[in-house]
Amino acid sequence: MLIRYKKSFEKIAMGLLSFMPNEKDLKQLQQTIKDYETDTDRQLFLWKEDEDIVGAIGVEKKDSEVEIRHISVNPSHRHQGIGKQMMDALKHLFKTQVLVPNELTQSFFERCQGQQDQDISYNN
């Protein structure tokens, strides 16, 4: 289930985002979380399986597009379709907008989708 990030989930969210290649530095990670907390165009969502939060996906709304800035799944929960479930939940949430990965999320995005979906475009 996709849930909206809350401050009480900060450490869990930071842990999940730290799996992103550009989020290894603690100061950068703290700034990323702060950006999601303060920028109204950015939203961070977490994926909950049973009682565990096992995934994170962060977006930035840009007119008719929603850019996927971050996407990460806990390594012990990978290869279970969680990335695809997060994408499907976002597509449902942002029905009138196009989901677009950025350079850092494109590879993961494509793997989660399995193939290019006509509702989704890709940045090159």
UniProtKB/Swiss-Prot annotation:
Example GO BP: riboflavin biosynthetic process
N-acetyltransferase domain sequence ranges: 3-124
UniProt cross-references to Pfam families, sorted A to Z: Acetyltransf_1
Broad EC category: transferase
InterPro entries xrefs: Acyl_CoA_acyltransferase, GNAT_dom
Keywords of this entry: Acyltransferase, Riboflavin biosynthesis, Transferase
Keyword Acyltransferase: yes
Function text: Involved in riboflavin biosynthesis.
The protein's name: Protein RibT
Organism: Bacillus subtilis (strain 168)
Taxonomic path: Bacteria, Bacillati, Bacillota, Bacilli, Bacillales
